[in-house]
A protein has these predicted regions:
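Nucleotide-state sensing region of NTPase/ATPase domains
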Residues: 2-68, 72-74, 80-86, 90, ...
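An accessory alpha-helical subdomain
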Residues: 66-159
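Short, hydrophobic-rich beta-strand element in sensory/regulatory alpha-beta domains
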Residues: 162
């Protein structure tokens, strides 16, 4: 729908595509409030899967680049939200890590008035290390799984070339 111009009711995407050493003529019609119509060499295509055999494309919208531009903190937040939904143990470890981090921060802040609080730091550091190790393990496996999906998607989009 984003491809239809402002104030317009429809848009057309026409293309001559050379794929698998054959030429294909595609015609895609987009309508506001109606289903799109697609043909490949004049034959109606039932769905976009019919086009994917002929045309390997990736469509990027500005919001797709958000994770790249937003920085590491936003990428970690995305990963945390994803992993919390997928792995309850990750959610527990993240919650524990955040709790320990907050306590340690309070100890450091209050230690000026109560220096004896600094004796508690080794215990909090150990807990942070344990929870952090669990988080790092889950994140590493998550990144490896995403990398495999990305590799496969790149392979398919590039016409099965590396």
């Amino acid at each position: 729908k984003e491809l239809i111009g402002f104030g317009m009711q429809e848009a057309a995407l026409l293309g001559d595509i050379l794929s698998r050493q054959r030429e294909f003529v595609t015609d895609i019609r987009l309508f506001r409030g109606k289903r799109r119509k697609m043909t490949v060499n004049g034959v109606p295509a039932k769905n976009s899967a019919a086009l994917s055999d002929v045309l390997h494309t990736v469509f990027f919208a500005p919001e797709d680049l958000f994770l790249i531009r937003a920085g590491a903190a936003e990428r970690r937040r995305f990963m945390d939200l994803s992993l919390c939904q997928l792995r309850p143990r990750y959610a527990e470890a993240l919650s524990q890590y955040n709790r320990l981090y907050e306590h340690k921060t309070r100890i450091l802040r209050d230690s000026e008035d109560k220096p004896e609080l600094l004796d508690l730091l080794p215990e909090f550091n150990e807990g942070l290390c344990r929870s952090g190790a669990v988080l790092i393990g889950y994140r590493a496996r998550f990144c490896a799984a995403l990398a495999e999906y990305a590799r496969q998607a790149h392979y398919e989009c590039s016409g099965e070339r590396d």
